[in-house]
Amino acid sequence: MGFGATLAVGLTIFVLSVVTIIICFTCSCCCLYKTCRRPRPVVTTTTSTTVVHAPYPQPPSVPPSYPGPSYQGYHTMPPQPGMPAAPYPMQYPPPYPAQPMGPPAYHETLAGGAAAPYPASQPPYNPAYMDAPKAAL
């Protein structure tokens, strides 16, 4: 037998053994399944524990800082002792400045009395102006 055949046989045996063990651990009739599922005895020691019930310290009552209405199913949670309170701003930030509306509108009367760069009246229609130029012969 060559090296490739020996390797194939060894790999096949390994895979079959792993599959057999997995099936045995999951099958209820196998002895490995029964030994793993059997409850282990609990070793107890004779240690006694004394529990002292002390009243839990209540935080001082703080009036709610939210000015809105309270809801029936909602209860505010008091802050935990030893934890810092959330920093609330003392005042609201200033509002944003209004956006500029663009350049002011143009008025001819405010232009300083300068003459218009074009005539105010429209010249009459001239069809000869639109004709193609004629080639000279």
UniProtKB/Swiss-Prot annotation:
Segments crossing the lipid bilayer: 3-23
Residues in coiled coil: none
Cell location: Endoplasmic reticulum membrane; Nucleus membrane
Chief location of this protein within or outside the cell: endoplasmic reticulum
Assigned GO CC terms: endoplasmic reticulum membrane; nuclear membrane
UniProt KW Hydrolase keyword: no
Keyword line: Apoptosis, Endoplasmic reticulum, Membrane, Nucleus, Transmembrane, Transmembrane helix
Domain of life per record: Eukaryota
GO biological process: apoptotic process
Function: Can induce apoptosis in a caspase-dependent manner and plays a role in p53/TP53-dependent apoptosis.
Subunit annotation: Interacts with PDCD6; PDCD6 can stabilize SHISA5.
PANTHER family: PROTEIN SHISA-5, SHISA
Family that this chain belongs to: Belongs to the shisa family.
Record protein name field: Protein shisa-5
Organism the protein comes from: Pongo abelii (Sumatran orangutan)
Taxonomic placement: Eukaryota, Metazoa, Chordata, Craniata, Vertebrata
